[in-house]
């Protein structure tokens, strides 16, 4: 399945969206209750012969859920795109493998052009604030999205980060995705 393929788990607490200097805090909203069905689970003693009708498709429900997730992401990405177009914001999604130099290229671009063009940055990372702190040192408005176990940004994360950035019209939004080549390609932002 999709999350098994990309390694992101549904048990994560969701992304943390922070500006440099903000503290990350965790809080609970009550006890999590885990429920699951035992339908299709059969327990047999050793040596007991049995047959089961396996003519149904076990993967049908998983595939439908994955399609719903991708469709929902596409709807939210279209909303983001309309917002960017209405405000004349040029948005770039930077995708590359971990350690390939995305942040270094971004730093150089921002340093060279920030006097001419208003920039805003969204940094995607599983855990750290390191990249956002590097961009903040250039006096560029930036927010960090920590995805936890997630290996890609999604359109709802970008939407919430954009609200926090308060991006002005006629600007450029640079989105540095989580360091991964496969997973981000499935999710338009």
Where are these regions (language model features)?
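Histidine-centered metal-binding segments
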Residues: 2-65
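Nucleotide-state-sensitive switch-loop elements of NTP-binding domains
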Residues: 57-82, 87-92, 100, 104, ...
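The Walker A (P-loop) glycine that initiates the GxxxxGKT/S ATP-binding motif of P-loop NTPases
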Residues: 96
């Amino acid at each position: 399945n999709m999350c098994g393929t990309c390694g992101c788990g549904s048990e994560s607490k969701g992304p943390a969206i922070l500006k440099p200097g903000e503290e990350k805090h965790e809080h609970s909203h009550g006890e999590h209750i885990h429920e699951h069905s035992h339908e299709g689970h059969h327990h047999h003693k050793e040596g007991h012969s049995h047959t089961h009708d396996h003519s149904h498709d076990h993967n049908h429900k998983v595939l439908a859920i994955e399609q719903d997730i991708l469709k929902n992401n596409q709807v939210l990405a279209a909303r983001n795109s309309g917002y960017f177009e209405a405000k004349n914001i040029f948005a770039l999604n930077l995708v590359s493998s971990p350690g390939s130099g995305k942040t270094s290229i971004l730093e150089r671009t921002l340093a060279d052009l920030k006097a001419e063009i208003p920039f805003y940055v969204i940094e995607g990372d599983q855990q750290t604030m390191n990249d956002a702190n590097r961009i903040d040192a250039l006096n560029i408005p930036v927010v960090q999205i920590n995805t936890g176990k997630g290996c890609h940004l999604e359109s709802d994360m970008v939407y919430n980060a954009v609200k926090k950035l308060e991006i002005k019209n006629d600007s450029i939004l640079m989105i540095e995705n989580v360091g991964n080549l496969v997973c981000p390609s499935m999710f338009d932002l």
